[in-house]
């Protein structure tokens, strides 16, 4: 069917079941926006006040919907404004497809008005980027972009499209499948290694599971809960893994790290086998990895082989999708008991006391604790960056249906308000709360307009 590339771009989004896009128009992306306007009954446009906030809104939408979300910007400063949001998504492995306009093909490299090398500028922060110069490549590029963004270790993909290309007329047909010879993520775990991992967990006297954000990325929340329950292994999380495991579960022992809770950190120091699932184990999670490696057998599951051994050595590395690997493990799992070990961990935290604030003041820890008690179970809490993030992570008690979103890797202030908007649009049935400090609020409060 003949149509313009802009119209074909809209058809690509429809084929990928995109219902909402977040962005801000400008001259270099106007042909695409005109086509979107004609499709307003199928795709809702959310007009943000700054391009990075469109990226953050797409970030929140992707986390709750579980599929790649779309943000749009024009060329030059519009595209460069988007880089912080791209880097934020990359650091936390969030699947977003970023579409930017570009100057006409014959003007690229001439330093014309609002020209910026966005593919080069964003290169460190994307899984892949495209400069779409051949109109006939439109369908293939979009199919690949959504596939790359949402598979393997998720992340942002950038498509930069010159204005003249958007206006070109092509014969459009969207491919049903995507085959990229150089990109084939390992999803299922090596069976021999899975058996070794299970043997190590069965032999352990003081096993401990550490959950990272990769469990959310793999949609493996139920699988990790089931395995932990069968084998009765206590659970801790990194910041990005918070809310995978409900706080009221007897196996849950809190967040690890510099800003974590005493009980979780003490458990790491005493365990004999540490089972890392989808966790990067960055500097805020484990300060002294070399010391831990000497005393503890470490099992590390991650879909990205580059993460295994990067920050902490692994005795038993296992590359694969957390959901599929955990299913393999559950099939082999035997019911076990670690009652004494779990009871001991519960004594390591000491008694947590709240100091009632003086009249006319607010204790933020008390505030967040009380907020958690008043909110419904199926709440999405979006924490910004700063001390408010730490208070939320340590004081908010999530129930099974709850979900925490935050910028854990990049630590991007101003994230919470637009991300909460995106999260709410992904699932309107969920209560959604943004928790932020005054500085972060002033960076993105205009999105409430």
Protein language model annotation of sequence segments:
Residues 24-26, 45-56, 71-78, 133-134, ...:
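Active-site nucleophile and cofactor-binding loops and adjacent substrate-binding regions
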Residues 136, 295-385:
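Phosphate/pyrophosphate-binding active-site segments
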Residues 99, 107-114, 270, 308-311, ...:
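Thiamine diphosphate
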Residues 63, 213-299, 399-429, 442-446:
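Glycine-rich, anion-gripping cofactor-binding loops and their flanking helix/strand elements
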Residues 6-14, 18-19, 27, 32-37, ...:
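Active-site diphosphate/adenylate-binding microenvironment
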Residues 2, 19-20, 63-74, 79-100, ...:
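Structural signature of the thiamine diphosphate
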Residues 29-32, 53-57, 77-86, 90, ...:
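Short glycine/serine/threonine-rich phosphate/pyrophosphate-binding segments
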Residues 2-87, 91-92:
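N-terminal cofactor/phosphate-binding cores enriched in small/glycine residues
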